[in-house]
Amino acid sequence: MSSSLVFQGEFQHIIRIYNTNVDGRRKIQYALTCVKGVGRRFANLVCKKADIDTSKRAGELSKDEVERLTTIMNHPRQYNIPTWFLNRQKDIKDGKYSHCLANQIDVKFREDLERLKKIRAHRGVRHHFGLRVRGQKTKTTGRRGRTVGVAGRR
């Protein structure tokens, strides 16, 4: 087992993965969570599939290991990661299971909201007007605009 205290070789303090700066001083399992769409469990699973020691620091990884991580994160279904683990299941357009990362999440989210607004779904209309979407009360909270003071006694 390799020790994290003594490391021979190049240590990178910042690694670029999916257009995200990953801190090289953190352990790889937690460093991957900097990437949008990667949580602790998904990062742990990806490290296990790539045969990378989870006690390693992110800066200790070689280029080959980083490449393995990114290919597994790109194509999780090819590496026998179950479909319930993915964050985009049964896509409304093509019906495929996929895992969105970094900028893909923002694009897909925006597309979903635009589709809801276009078909005039209740959620889409609430999003359009900037109101609460998930059934919260709006009588007293969530007010915006000018504040109206209480009329004092004359």
From Swiss-Prot:
Located at the top of the head of the 40S subunit, it contacts several helices of the 18S rRNA. One of its GO terms (cellular component) is cytosol. This is Small ribosomal subunit protein uS13. InterPro entries: Rbsml_uS13_C, Ribosomal_uS13, Ribosomal_uS13-like_H2TH, Ribosomal_uS13_CS. Disulfide bonds: none annotated. PANTHER family: 30S RIBOSOMAL PROTEIN S13/40S RIBOSOMAL PROTEIN S18, SMALL RIBOSOMAL SUBUNIT PROTEIN US13. It comes from Dictyostelium discoideum (Social amoeba). The keyword rRNA-binding applies. Belongs to the universal ribosomal protein uS13 family. The gene is rps18. The keyword Iron-sulfur does not apply.
